[in-house]
């Protein structure tokens, strides 16, 4: 009997996770069919995507409100479809604000549900753990410190490691990657990663470009490289660069961040998966982030944020190895100064690379295989196999 799995991812990092899970499940059970929402990697792995993944890629309270009607319509359409064509299991890949409601309603219909990537309930809006407990039969956790928190709140969870740690290894010598990208093997290289969402690029792109201009003026011969995941983000960031810094020698690469990061001496990045990728490659980073002022002050006033750091590298380390410049601190001048603090201190960079290597080793678990085994066990238990 063919197994049908519903699956939804909302952004590029989720697309990577979802694609790995699909491939691992199909390796174990070739008869499984997948449909829902996914990006190019999930589609290539065999998922039928009923809506473009980009329609779900919005962030922040204000930004979500602007797209709320469309988001609700998509979720309603998926639920209506799966009421008729009921899947044997549903996997929500991250995107908790979209997926948890869908999971809860499908679970009420008797569909076993998995949430792949624990929401950061230990860091942000901890009250969501009740929603998570009601929505998911099983949470697949990708960070080692999450399990104790989830267990204490009655959430069934399994730590599966992080798939990027299986895929990305430290790169000590940047020369081969620079040669492949057409960059000179000598001289400083700064990787600039302004985020994977258009709203992120609009919010922090100008500050990042301003910082790049200041750094280039201080370090003659500096080269800039920016990997961009899709045409929309490339077009948005390229337009900002053309407006604010048309004279800078800047290489845009149509690829994942991990393909360009090893070429860099230092990384200037938005908060998000890119901070983990920089850690896995072993590159020091400066993290900048800014959201709509209403989003930020609402979070502050309601005490929705529970942790000291926003960068995963710092959360894993338990200390601020990567400087974090948030909201009003995220200025071109302060970002540039933080980057210079690394470019001027090779010994500091080497020590951070060593620490990042230790942290990366804790994340390597053959994640997709571990996740697939957990999913198949839940399917078998629900069917009485």
Give each language-model segment a name.
Residues 1-385:
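Nucleotide-activated sugar donor-binding and catalytic core shared by glycosyltransferases
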């Amino acid at each position: 009997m063919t197994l049908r799995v519903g699956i939804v991812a909302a952004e590029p990092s989720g697309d990577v996770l979802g694609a790995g899970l699909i491939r691992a499940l199909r390796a174990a059970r070739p008869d499984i069919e997948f449909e829902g929402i996914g990006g190019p990697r999930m589609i290539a792995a065999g998922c039928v995507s009923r809506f473009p993944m980009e329609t779900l890629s919005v962030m922040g309270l204000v930004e979500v409100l602007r797209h709320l009607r469309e988001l609700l319509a998509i979720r309603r359409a998926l639920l209506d479809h799966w009421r008729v064509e009921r899947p044997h299991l549903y996997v929500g890949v991250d995107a908790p604000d979209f997926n948890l409601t869908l999971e809860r309603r499908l679970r009420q219909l008797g569909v076993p549900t998995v949430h792949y990537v624990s929401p950061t309930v230990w860091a942000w809006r901890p009250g969501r753990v009740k929603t998570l407990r009601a929505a998911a039969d099983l949470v697949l956790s990708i960070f080692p410190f999450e399990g104790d928190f989830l267990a204490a709140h009655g959430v069934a969870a399994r730590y599966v490691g992080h798939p990027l740690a299986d895929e990305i290894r430290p790169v000590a010598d940047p020369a081969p990657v620079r040669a492949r990208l057409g960059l000179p093997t000598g001289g400083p290289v700064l990787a600039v990663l302004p985020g994977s969402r258009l709203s992120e690029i609009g919010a922090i792109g100008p500050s990042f470009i301003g910082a790049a201009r200041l750094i280039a003026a201080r370090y003659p011969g500096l080269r800039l490289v920016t990997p961009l995941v899709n045409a929309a983000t490339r077009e948005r960031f390229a337009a900002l660069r053309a407006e604010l810094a048309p004279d800078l020698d800047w290489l845009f690469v149509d690829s994942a961040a991990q393909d360009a990061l090893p070429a860099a001496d230092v990384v200037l990045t938005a908060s998000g998966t890119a901070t983990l990728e920089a850690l896995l490659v072993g590159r020091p980073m400066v993290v900048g982030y800014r959201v709509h002022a209403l989003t930020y002050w609402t979070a502050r006033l309601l005490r929705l944020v529970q942790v000291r750091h926003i960068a995963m590298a710092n959360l894993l380390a338990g200390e601020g190895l990567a400087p974090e410049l948030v909201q009003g601190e995220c200025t071109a001048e302060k970002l540039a100064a933080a980057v210079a603090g690394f470019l001027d201190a090779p010994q500091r960079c080497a020590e951070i690379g060593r620490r990042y290597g230790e942290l990366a080793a804790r994340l390597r678990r053959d994640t997709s295989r571990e996740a697939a085994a957990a999913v198949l066990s839940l399917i078998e238990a629900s069917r009485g196999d």
